[in-house]
Amino acid sequence: MTGQRATPQPTLDDLPLRDDLRGKSPYGAPQLAVPVRLNTNENPHPPSRALVDDVVRSVARAAADLHRYPDRDAVQLRSDLARYLTAQTGVQLGVENLWAANGSNEILQQLLQAFGGPGRSAIGFVPSYSMHPIISDGTRTEWLQAARADDFSLDVDAAVAAVTERTPDVVFVASPNNPSGQSVSLSGLRRLLDAAPGIVIVDEAYGEFSSQPSAVQLVGEYPTKLVVTRTMSKAFAFAGGRLGYLIATPAVIEAMLLVRLPYHLSSVTQAAARAALRHADDTLGSVAALIAERERVSTALTGMGFRVIPSDANFVLFGEFTDAPASWQRYLDAGVLIRDVGIPGYLRATTGLAEENDAFLRASAQLAATELAPVNVGAIASAAEPRAAGRDHVLGAP
């Protein structure tokens, strides 16, 4: 203001922030206007005209009641989700087995509000999804971690040993894992469930791409332990809609009612998600094409000399680069945005449309000639401690 001395803007250090949050890095993924965006594992196929029209009609109907609060428990949406999952998994589910929220991250947060918190701990097997430790920190749940195998797969023996030794209240298992892409078999999950003293959260964000049966099949066997989380952001091509959900015994849904905020899912979100579910067969028809493209990309990268981690999702983790952040920048300079997930020597690329994958492979061929390194023996050990990952600052985010 004129005539007054400008007051310096306060920084984060000037605020009475919780001590355990000081020095933490927020979630971050570049959102850049580039020709090819392969960094956040979205479904590259846009919604069909029929789906868009259905969403518009559904939201218009919901808009007529915007002066009223939405269905607090999203009963119709949860019923639709139960029907979809019953058809997909063969497991008979009802509204009492489903809970929905604004993306699977809110689901994970609610789970830790209910089953984690001060004096409790959660364990994950790294490298894995970066939001697991971030949400643990936010709910003041002690974060524990154990390393994956040298190929980034889950060493079930080592995982069981870590759970047995450290007795966490919550166990996180991503299947398929992000950022490496491997799924965990039902037999492996059973061993973890048998060893775990508390809740086991199987994060199936990429479940529709997996070659393994869904962990939903085990909910009846482990009703007091198992929670399966999923999202409509990946295979469902509904990332902009922000809808996540969980499958569990009805008692877990009762626990969610204790911690959820009232009216947490807007009437617009509920209407749009229900419309998307009505077009599930059409939308999920792209999954087979994306899997075929993933395999084409993996084969081409291998032929160029890259080490490609076998994937069961809609992305591939590949290396080994002498300087992954520098290589990430070279991809960006070529108009291709991929992901530095914080694993030394490795980058991750989403499977896009055929023409997007072709552009990515052209850039990869140029980099393969100059930027590949011998096998990085220390990659796993280094990845066990999160670091500032080039431009992303996270491990294995969406």
Curated annotation (Swiss-Prot):
First-tier enzyme category under EC: transferase
One Pfam family of this chain: Aminotran_1_2
Amino-acid biosynthesis is among the record's keywords: yes
EC number of this enzyme: 2.6.1.9
Ranges of Polar residues composition bias in the record: 1-10
Lineage: superkingdom: Bacteria
Assigned keywords, A-Z: Amino-acid biosynthesis, Aminotransferase, Histidine biosynthesis, Pyridoxal phosphate, Transferase
GO biological process terms, semicolon-separated: L-histidine biosynthetic process
Residues bearing PTM N6-(pyridoxal phosphate)lysine: K234
UniProt key word Membrane: no
Cofactor: pyridoxal 5'-phosphate
Pathway: Amino-acid biosynthesis; L-histidine biosynthesis; L-histidine from 5-phospho-alpha-D-ribose 1-diphosphate: step 7/9
Disordered: annotated span: 1-30
Quaternary state and interactors: Homodimer.
HAMAP family: HisC_aminotrans_2
Similarity remark: Belongs to the class-II pyridoxal-phosphate-dependent aminotransferase family. Histidinol-phosphate aminotransferase subfamily.
Name of the protein this chain belongs to: Histidinol-phosphate aminotransferase
Organism: Mycobacterium avium (strain 104)
Gene transcribed to yield this protein: hisC
